[in-house]
Amino acid sequence: MGEVYDFFLSSYSGYSRVDIVLEFLAFWFGIISVVFAKKQNILVYPTGIICTLITMYLMYKVSLLGHILVNLLYTIISLFGWWNWSRRENNDLVVKVSKFTSNEFTKSLLIFFIIVFVAYFAHDFFATNFEGQIKELDILTSGIFVTAMWLMANKKLENWILWIIGNVITIPLYLSSDKIILSIQYVIFTILAIQAYIEWKKSLSK
């Protein structure tokens, strides 16, 4: 039992109780948000915004600037997605699950490269302590996650593929920052994203 405690909580020995509570809240709101997204429930957005605001604070404290940028953009895109998912015409939802077109694929690539570019210069401008592979992973996942969020806001099936890829990359990134709880969260995110892809694909064929 002591070994389990050491594994999960020893890395938090220097953290305030408030920060530990906030990380647990981000953990649960993040998972709840993905569950709502999986079910195409609009509550994905208010729960997700709570998670992103908390996560921005936590990432600021460990200088993961790419993820601060990601979560700021999550919040902005979530507001758009909230509005977009709620739109109706003749009492029928306007935005439904679909695959992206070649034009939307091009837009997604453009969003990805813009975010990678911004995240790269954000690291250099703020002179973060992260170098080499960790810095590169933070920049890469920034581009992946913002692009995935944009695709989700437009109910594109491919958003889940990007979430899966980004989640798998993020797990070791958070482990290297002693964010054990958030690392476990991203393992759960990966499982939920796989399930969500399957569910959205089924709804696409209906």
Residue ranges of model-derived segments:
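Polytopic alpha-helical membrane-helix bundles and their juxtamembrane interface segments
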Residues: 2-39, 88-92, 96-206
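Gly/Ser/Thr-rich helix-start
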Residues: 31, 49, 64-67
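Membrane-interface helix-loop junction between the first two transmembrane segments
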Residues: 36-50
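Helix-loop junctions on the outward
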Residues: 40-43, 55-70
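Hydrophobic alpha-helical transmembrane segments of multi-pass membrane proteins
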Residues: 48-58, 77
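Individual alpha-helical transmembrane segments in multi-pass integral membrane proteins
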Residues: 67, 71-77, 186
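Membrane-water interface of transmembrane alpha-helices
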Residues: 73-90
